[in-house]
Each structure stands twice: as C-alpha cells, then as structure tokens.
Amino acid sequence: MSCTIEKILTDAKTLLERLREHDAAAESLVDQSAALHRRVAAMREAGTALPDQYQEDASDIKDMSKYKPHILLSQENTQIRDLQQENRELWVSLEEHQDALELIMSKYRKQMLQLMVAKKAADAEPVLKAHQSHSAEIENQIDRICEMGEVMRKAVQMDDDQFCKIQEKLAQLELENKELRELLSISSESLQVRKESSVDTASQGIK
C-alpha cells in the first residue's frame, strides 16, 4: 500500500510541476504577444512619420508587420489552446489521482482503526483477565464474609438463646431459693414453737 501511495504522490507532484511549467509557458506567450502588438503599433507610428522617400519602404514594412504578427499570433493561440487542453487533462488526471489517494487513505485509516481496536483488545485482554480474576477473588471474599456473618449471627442468636435460658434458670433458681428459705423459716419457727411447747409441758409436769 505504501508503494502505491508513494507512486500516487510522485505522479501528483509531477503533474503539478507540469502544470506550473505550462502556466509559465502560457504567460510567456502572452507576454510575447503583447510585445509583438507593441512592436506593430510602434512600426505603424514610425511608418506614418517617415518622409516621402521612405513611404514605399514603410508600406512594405507595414505589410510585413501585418503579416508576420498575424502568423505568430495564430501559432501562439494554437499553442495556448493546446496547453490549455493539456492542462485540463492534467487536472483531470490529478483529480483522479487525488480520488484514488483518498480511497487508499480511507482504506488505510479503516485498517489502522481495526488494527488499533484489535491491539487495544489484545492489550486489554490481560487486564480483563486480571480484572475478572480479581473480581472472582473479591466475590469469593464477599461470599466468605457473608458466610462468616451468618455464622456470627447464628452464634449471637445461640448466645442470646443461651443467655435467655441461663437467665430463666437463674430466675427459677432464685425463686426456688426464696421458696426454700421461706420453707426453712417456717420449719424453724414450727420447731421453735414445738420446742417451747415441750418445755412448757415439762415444766407443768414437774410442778
């Protein structure tokens, strides 16, 4: 592709140089035509100002000046038309080369874009794999954290349940202890009353 682009650029450069040469040649012909017109005008003025002895020579010069510039101008006009036609053909050829160059550059840009996209994809593949691996690791860590959280929640719930059971047991033990103390107190009072009654009975029997 590079060779084709270089060839097109070289051809385009050559065409532009030829166009410049033709423009310069056309300008030179126009200048020559203007110079011939000035010479003819000067010869005519000189012919009208010559003395009588030079009138015949002057008329011959006038005839020659009329004839020669006409031929020269005709030839120059033909050359100018040929140059203009060649210039038009060169411009058409240059435009065709430009169109071909634009088409090639368009395809080249498209291919480069595809290569860049492929390169970016290739460059991004390791990063993507690392990202996927890292994401999988993070997901595993999140799963482990969730599992640990569930275990902790269950443990806390079990601790709460155990605490509640212990609290209930303590309350029950306190209640039973209180009841036992009351029973012991009642028993102690009953024994004391019985003891006192026995003492009183024994005292009365002695009397």
UniProtKB/Swiss-Prot annotation:
InterPro entries: SIKE. GO terms for cellular component: cytoplasm; FAR/SIN/STRIPAK complex. It is found in: Cytoplasm. It comes from the Eukaryota. Residues 70-102, 162-192 form a coiled coil. Its main location: cytoplasm. One of its GO terms (biological process) is negative regulation of hippo signaling. GO terms for molecular function: protein-macromolecule adaptor activity. Keywords: Coiled coil, Cytoplasm. The keyword Cytoplasm applies. It holds the Pfam family SIKE. Interacts with IKBKE and TBK1 via its coiled coil region. Interaction with TBK1 is disrupted upon viral infection or TLR3 stimulation. Interacts with CDC42BPB. Interacts with SIKE1 which mediates association with the STRIPAK core complex composed of PP2A catalytic and scaffolding subunits, the striatins (PP2A regulatory subunits), the striatin-associated proteins MOB4, STRIP1 and STRIP2, PDCD10 and members of the STE20 kinases, such as STK24 and STK26. PANTHER family: SIKE FAMILY MEMBER, SUPPRESSOR OF IKBKE 1. Belongs to the SIKE family. Physiological suppressor of IKK-epsilon and TBK1 that plays an inhibitory role in virus- and TLR3-triggered IRF3. Inhibits TLR3-mediated activation of interferon-stimulated response elements (ISRE) and the IFN-beta promoter. May act by disrupting the interactions of IKBKE or TBK1 with TICAM1/TRIF, IRF3 and RIGI. Does not inhibit NF-kappa-B activation pathways. Associates with the striatin-interacting phosphatase and kinase (STRIPAK) core complex, forming the extended (SIKE1:SLMAP)STRIPAK complex. This is Suppressor of IKBKE 1. The lineage of its organism: Eukaryota, Metazoa, Chordata, Craniata, Vertebrata. The gene is SIKE1.
